[in-house]
Amino acid sequence: MNTFGDNFRVTTWGESHGKALGAVIDGCPANLPILEEDIQNELNRRRPGYSIFSTPRKEEDMLEILSGIFEGKTTGTPISGLVFNKGQKSKDYSKIKDTPRPGHADLNYFLKYGNYDYRGGGRSSGRTTIGNVIGGAVAKKLIEFTHNIKIIGYSTKIGKINGDFDYYKNPEFFESDSNIEKLFEKTENNPLRCPSKNSDEMKDYVLDAMDKKDSVGGIIEIIIKGIPQGVGNPVFNKLEGKLGSAFIGINAVKGFEIGRGFESSDLYGSEMNDEYYIDENSINEKTNNAGGIIGGISTGSPVVLRVSIKPTPSISKIQDSVNLISNENEKIEIGGRHDPIIVPRVIPVLESMAAITVADLMISGGYINPCRL
């Protein structure tokens, strides 16, 4: 499937070395103020060349809106946007077209379909997340305009090095919108999008991996602030279930947790439970160990999510593989231009999928008028 969502639907299309990539967004209400540059700004955060740790593939990723936005507002009709590929070098892959790359979807695609686009992974490439970000930019605008919901992501771990900043070290920090704006500026000016004081140590770790012709992964934390109580449904349409599906749909993602996550298995119930109190006739939580979701439904506290990102599978080391034509063992050495770490570029993609998920559930739950704003 290439479509995500039930009421706010995003269909992505395109391949890494194809002519273009893009998205069609269906279900966005009319009259949402949005400019092409709002979407372009999100694409700029994802595109190659973000930092010294990004692939040297040169792509401007300039957006073209084909429909659905007129005179600075959505019309209520499908929004279609695309980005043309201009910097692809398909010849880099011609020598290994019959030799699947370890860690990539090449072999699985070939075994399932009997055919696959070997040029940069085709549809399984991280470049296809351009469509996710186009859809996510619209969703971000929608939930912020209607409910002042803000979504921010940042690295908390790079390789084996843990950072010193995350939600649970200072939850009060996230109560202020101005703090979130400052955090965004800080992370965007860091090549690893990491606000931790020891980010220089992390940079050295990645540089060392590059020298060894290797790659590294990491952990990203995503915070959704301002989501009202009641978003999501019990059992099979849970908020965390939808978010998990959205995140796991990104190829680099290998793990997902909510709130205290796996750490909660170490805690007593008395430590994990979020106790309640009344303040100015409002029921509040003393803590947010559940991460803003209980019973599949948002509590009104910030939603706290963490995602594990695997090391970039394209590395320059010689690896063992097979030849699909001769059916013999074969060594493979991957050329081309690749990220030694994909973590910082995945952050805007995760933010986008979180926004799409929230927008979809808020429309279905009656928080946002599906017709017009």
From Swiss-Prot:
Pathway: Metabolic intermediate biosynthesis; chorismate biosynthesis; chorismate from D-erythrose 4-phosphate and phosphoenolpyruvate: step 7/7. It catalyses: 5-O-(1-carboxyvinyl)-3-phosphoshikimate = chorismate + phosphate. GO terms for molecular function: chorismate synthase activity; FMN binding. Pfam families: Chorismate_synt. The keyword Flavoprotein applies. Reduced FMN (FMNH(2)). FMN binds at residues 123-125, 251-252, 295, 310-314, 337. NADP(+) binds at residue 46. CDD domains: Chorismate_synthase (cd07304). Its EC number is 4.2.3.5. The keyword Nuclease does not apply. One of its GO terms (cellular component) is cytosol. Belongs to the chorismate synthase family. This reaction introduces a second double bond into the aromatic ring system. This is Chorismate synthase.
